[in-house]
Amino acid sequence: MARTSLPILPGTVEFLALGALAHGGRMHGFEVLRWIGETSEGDLLVEEGALYPALHRLEKRGLLRAEWAVSEKGRRAKYYQVTPAGREALTAESRQWERYVAAVGKVVEGEA
């Protein structure tokens, strides 16, 4: 049976984009999509229609910096990189996510 990707939970696209850019470095949107897919071994496939609005929101909040440049294929592309505020936000969100996963694990396993 073929393995399918996991559903992207509401509110996680911004978190995934921040993580991709924090660890993968400066990238344009399509590279962010590819990085998330490859790094998650295909388990997380973000749609373009979800990613680009998320990148715009992150940029507006000052968590990403963006600039136009020419891509490897000779096309104009908007490149993103994480700001110091974005790194702080990623750290805080990572802690919250770890806490959430641990709490769900306790409930599912019936731990007290």
Identify the role of each PLM range.
Residues 1-11, 93:
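Intrinsically disordered, low-complexity serine/threonine- and proline-rich regulatory segments
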Residues 6-7, 55, 111-112:
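Short, contiguous hydrophobic alpha-helices characteristic of membrane insertion segments
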Residues 7-50:
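N-terminal helix-turn-helix DNA-binding core of bacterial DNA-binding proteins
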Residues 19, 34, 53, 91, ...:
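A cross-family signal for key residues in well-ordered alpha-helices
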Residues 22, 87-112:
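Amphipathic alpha-helical dimerization/coiled-coil segments
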Residues 51-58:
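Basic amphipathic alpha-helical segments that dock to polyanions
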Residues 59-76, 81:
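Beta-hairpin "wing" of winged helix-turn-helix
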Residues 82-86:
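Accessory beta->alpha helical hairpin/"wing" motif in late/C-terminal subdomains of nucleic-acid enzymes
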